[in-house]
Each structure stands twice: as structure tokens, then as C-alpha cells.
């Protein structure tokens, strides 16, 4: 969401953007917790609670899941203010998706339970730039770059980058 927010507000100089598992629409946090976060954000913005997101929903690779669980920098807590800002940013992005002017590549796993793929699909449909591409990976979980099909994901990513870096290079060279 951060890269989209930036690209919509400051598109100058960007050659394109790539997003994976865009958290638009339904996410793996219960609606009750999101409403509670919104209410508490006004009076106790630093209040935090467990989001309830299951750490095994990131990847189908057991080694990756185990490493994520052991990583002291990964956690499943969120603050009340995070919930409020997340929802506000998501709504703003949906409203302004049509204004995205740079090449756009969105990737999502169709089995993602953290950020449901329908949200990515809906956002993609609102984007009007002619240079846009959406790729959904069958069985893919939330963390596509660390899922069992990461080679397939990386191949699509490299192909998109090669096509866009080449066209960007030719565009700049023609101006010289």
C-alpha cells in the first residue's frame, strides 16, 4: 500500500511499480478487531492487540513458516492507530486508483488468507493506465517470494522487469 500511495501522490520519476498481495478489501483480521481499532484510535492510539493472523498463512514451505515464527522481528500485533490508518489509506487508494499513471504489475496468490485476492482484482480493475498487468498464482499464499512456487513468481517478475527496463532504456536513449 505504501508504494501505491507514493506513486499516486508523486509519480514523477517512477518507471513503474510492482505490488504483491495487495491488502485491499477483506484482510485476515476480523472486522470486529478493525472496528475496535478504529474506535480506540481516537482515545488510545497505541493500544495493541493480536491481529489473529495465523503465521502459517504466509507460505506453504514449512521451513519458511518455522523461520518466520522464530524471527523475533516478526509478530502478529497491531495498534489501534494502524487499523485506522490502514483503512483510511485503503479507501483513499481505491478512490484514486484511476489516477495511477505509471506501469503497474500486481501479483497475488489465489489461496492468500492474509490479503484476499479479490481486493487486488478490484483495485486492478480501477487502474486505467494502459500498461498494467495482473498475475494470480494458483495455490499461492501471501508471501509469494517465499512460497513453494517462488521460482515461477520470480520468473514472471524478471520478465516484467526486463520488458519495462528495456522500454524505459529505449525511451531515455531516444531523448538523447
Name each region found by the language model.
Residues 27-69:
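Helix-rich cap/lid subdomain of alpha/beta-hydrolase
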Residues 100, 106-108, 112:
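Short beta-strand/loop motif that positions the catalytic acidic residue
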